[in-house]
């Protein structure tokens, strides 16, 4: 990298030289035309980002709106948000794994294990010895101890603390409480991620093999915990049930809008004008203002619509933004901050781009690799809470079936590369919206489950093809 051109002893400006990417000469503001041409050049070079998913989302909304009068009703929009939230959350965790070019096929059944332990603690009033039986109880406790030790070996401290907290909850029989149940689910998810990550990062088993084996194993654990044909209800706990079925008040809905839209505008505009003050290249101010304005207007419109009564029964009132919206927004904000604004996030991208170069740069590759699996399983546990809340119970097949495939599909469809090093957390949200709309729209058209799976599979195949072609074009350019 060349230094910024400075004034010599004669007072004359030094000639500009160096590569186009040198920060020293990267100090002019782009015009709108230049910004658009640069973006088009990136697209032609194979860097599509989330553009295909956004275009697909637009086409799907238009198509299903034309085919079904129910699709754009307030009740269906609210239901769509609640239906897709669980998959979106699990997909967010998987983005961290995919950024390293790895895969976690066990995230779905891992979420099922977390949900089943949460429900057992609630149903059995905290008496986990009675819930599990002697053998399973002690095996579960030993597993959590091992998970904490494995995380400690690589100094992943959340992976140490949370399993220990979960172990304490189980051993002393903490009385049932919705917040305790959710914390316990998170602890179980973290424990599972610690084992998965260690086997991949330190033992050296390929992630596909490890997570495929654990996908089967955790499915068996859920069946063992709940029993064949059994079901654990959680709808009687108001807090747990309202996670995916409750709504904010009208006042709190608008407060959420002000915080979310205002925070987004402040961050985007703050970064933009900071770059201008430092003389760095920035997008044209009008384009930035348009982008912020579109987000704010759409958010305000969505908030207004969701604060209207959407109940079909005239004797019932249902209004307010669903609780799942702030849950997803908080996770999206935290995850985006971690990936974009911390050294840990930069290390993830570095390892995903070139693990050997990252190792030579002093990055603890094994620690990074293990940590993303801890994150994926922990976030999958949060997704399990939302999904279980939506259906009101935990069944032996929880986390199985299409849960994992839809979550991976959401991340990939949204624009996260299967080859590592490229992706954003928002990809999971965009891709999750595509999958949720396909499932919801085809359901409204009374299509059978087979059609939903076929269409979703074809969309995922198309997204993976775009990713592969994008990578090939980028390598050729």
PLM segments and residue spans:
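Single transmembrane alpha-helix segments in multi-pass membrane proteins
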Residues: 61-67, 72-125, 143-156, 198-208, ...
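Alpha-helical transmembrane segments within multi-pass membrane transporters and channels
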Residues: 127-163, 172-215, 268, 272, ...
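Transmembrane helix-bundle core of multi-pass membrane transporters
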Residues: 131-139, 179, 218-339, 396, ...
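Membrane-interfacial amphipathic/re-entrant helices at transmembrane-helix boundaries
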Residues: 24-91, 124-141, 168-181, 313-318
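Short cytoplasmic-facing helical segments at TM-TM junctions of multi-pass membrane proteins
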Residues: 344-369
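Inter-helical junctions in multi-pass inner-membrane proteins, predominant
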Residues: 67-79, 126-130, 172-177, 222-223, ...
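Cytosolic-side transmembrane-helix boundaries in multi-pass membrane proteins
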Residues: 2-62, 143-157, 161-165, 230, ...
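Transmembrane alpha-helical segments in multi-pass inner-membrane proteins
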Residues: 193, 373-380, 384, 390-456
């Amino acid at each position: 990298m060349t230094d910024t051109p400075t004034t010599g002893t004669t007072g004359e400006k030094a000639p500009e030289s160096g590569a186009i990417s040198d920060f020293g000469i990267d100090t002019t503001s782009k015009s709108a035309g230049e910004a658009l041409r640069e973006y088009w050049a990136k697209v032609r070079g194979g860097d599509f980002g989330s553009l295909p998913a956004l275009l697909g989302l637009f086409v799907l909304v238009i198509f299903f709106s034309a085919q079904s009068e129910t699709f754009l009703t307030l009740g269906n929009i609210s239901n769509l948000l609640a239906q897709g939230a669980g998959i979106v959350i699990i997909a967010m965790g998987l983005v961290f794994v995919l950024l390293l070019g790895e895969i976690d096929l066990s995230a779905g059944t891992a979420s099922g294990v977390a949900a089943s332990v949460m429900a057992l603690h609630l149903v059995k009033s905290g008496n986990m010895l009675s819930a599990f039986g002697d053998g399973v109880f002690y095996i579960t406790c030993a597993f959590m101890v091992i998970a904490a030790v494995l995380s400690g070996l690589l100094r992943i401290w959340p992976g140490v603390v949370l399993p220990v907290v979960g172990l304490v909850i189980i051993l002393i029989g903490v009385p049932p409480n919705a917040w305790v149940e959710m914390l316990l689910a998170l602890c179980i998810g973290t424990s599972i991620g610690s084992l998965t990550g260690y086997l991949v990062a330190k033992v050296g088993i390929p992630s596909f093999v490890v997570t495929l084996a654990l996908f089967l194993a955790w499915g068996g654990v859920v069946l063992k915990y709940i029993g064949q044909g059994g079901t654990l209800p959680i709808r009687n706990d108001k807090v747990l049930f309202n996670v995916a079925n409750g709504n904010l008040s009208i006042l709190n809905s608008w407060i959420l809008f002000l915080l979310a839209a205002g925070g987004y505008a402040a961050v985007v505009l703050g970064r933009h004008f900071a770059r201008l003050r430092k003389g760095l290249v920035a997008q044209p101010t009008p384009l930035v203002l348009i982008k912020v304005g579109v987000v704010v207007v759409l958010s305000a419109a969505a908030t207004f619509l969701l604060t209207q009564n959407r109940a079909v029964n005239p004797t019932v009132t249902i209004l307010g933004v669903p609780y799942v919206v702030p849950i997803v927004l908080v996770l999206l904000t935290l995850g985006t901050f971690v990936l974009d604004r911390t050294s840990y996030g930069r290390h993830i991208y570095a390892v995903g781009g070139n693990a050997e170069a990252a190792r030579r740069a002093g990055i603890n590759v094994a620690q990074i690799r293990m940590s993303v699996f801890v994150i994926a399983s922990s976030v999958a546990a949060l997704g399990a809470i939302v999904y279980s809340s939506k259906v009101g119970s935990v069944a032996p097949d929880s986390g199985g079936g299409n849960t994992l495939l839809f979550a991976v599909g959401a991340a990939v469809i949204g624009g996260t590369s299967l080859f590592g090093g490229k992706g954003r957390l928002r990809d999971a949200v965009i891709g999750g919206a595509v999958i949720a709309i396909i499932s919801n729209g085809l359901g409204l058209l009374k299509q059978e489950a087979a059609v939903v799976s076929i269409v979703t599979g074809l969309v995922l195949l198309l997204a993976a093809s775009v990713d592969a072609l994008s990578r090939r074009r980028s390598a050729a350019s």
